[in-house]
Amino acid sequence: RKYDLKALKSPYVTELMEKLQENNIKICVCSNSEKARVINCLEELELTSYVTGVYGGTDCGHTKPDPFIYIQAMKDNNISPDETIVIEDSTAGIKAGVASGAYVIAYKDSYDIADQHEANVIVNNFIEAEKYIFSK
């Protein structure tokens, strides 16, 4: 799909990742895409240095809305659901994040009209997302 990983290309993603890293907040990318595709995208966008873990749904055998990918990332990083914030732009991803027990921020983009009502909060950009992350 040509829209896969589009959120990584959004304005202010790099700045947000820098700030999270400066504050010792772990960043994992959990995608329904293949892990290799996610890694290639991160490399292309020069974001790999910010990321603690990459999880591909097609590689682990569980795709969103199954929460497995988020639960596995939490387990691997020794983080509980109440310490986890998921930023998602898809309906399936939001459902997975909610089912994992994480706090879910829905990112509203111009490409997709996803059903985002299950998220804890909906933001229009990553500057807004940052405010919720650091207020939680």
Where are these regions (language model features)?
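Asp-based, Mg2+/Mn2+-dependent phosphohydrolase catalytic module
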Residues: 18-21, 35-136
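Short, acidic loop-to-helix structural element flanking the phosphoryl-transfer center
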Residues: 1-29, 35, 39
